Amino acid sequence: ASMGADLTDAEINQSAMIADPLTLFDCCPISDGAAAVVVTRKGSGSSNGASHPVRVLASAQASGRARLSAHSDRCSFKATKTAACQAFEMSGLNPSDIDLVELHDCFSIAEIIDAEDLGFMQKGHGGGWASEGRTKVSGDLPINPSGGLEAKGHPVGATGLGPVSYTHLRAHETAS
C-alpha cells in the first residue's frame, strides 16, 4: 500500500536486492506521518465521551547495540527480550494473555524475530506461524493487523506511537 500499487509475489521476489536475502519490497519505505496520544492520570480532566478508557498496565524500554554485526545472535534482539520481560512482569500478564500484537516490522524478517523475542511463539517457529496463517487477522494471534510499516511506510517520528494509536482504536471497537 505504501508503494502506491498492488504487487505480485513475483514482483516482490524479483525486486532489487538490498541486503541478501532482503529485496526492496522486504524493506519498509520512509514516509511522512504523525501520531498523537493524550495521557492523563486517573480522574484528571474530561474523558471527552470516551466510554471505554484504556489503561496502560506496563511500559518498558531497553537498548542494544546498533550494529547487527555486534550481536551474538543475528536472529534475536536482546533489548526486545529485556523490555518484554520487564513489561510482562510489571503487568502481571504473559505472552499467552495477549490477543492482538502491533510490532515494529521495518523489514519482513523483523516481524518474525520480534514475535519470537516477545515470547509469542518458540524460537524458530515464527516463520511457520506466519506461513500457516496463524498471525493473520483471523488467526490464533493477529500480528500487525494494521498492515505494519511495510504497508503504511515508516513515518519515523510517528513509528512508535502509530501501533499504540491503532491498538487503542481496536480496543474501543471491541469494547463497543
Where are these regions (language model features)?
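Glycine-rich, mobile lid/loop segments that gate access to catalytic sites or pores
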Residues: 1-21
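Condensing-enzyme catalytic core mediating Claisen C-C bond formation in acyl metabolism
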Residues: 17-82, 86, 134-146
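Beta-strand segments within the central parallel beta-sheet cores of soluble alpha/beta enzyme folds
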Residues: 51-61, 95-104, 124-132, 141-144, ...
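Conserved thiamine diphosphate
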Residues: 1, 102, 151
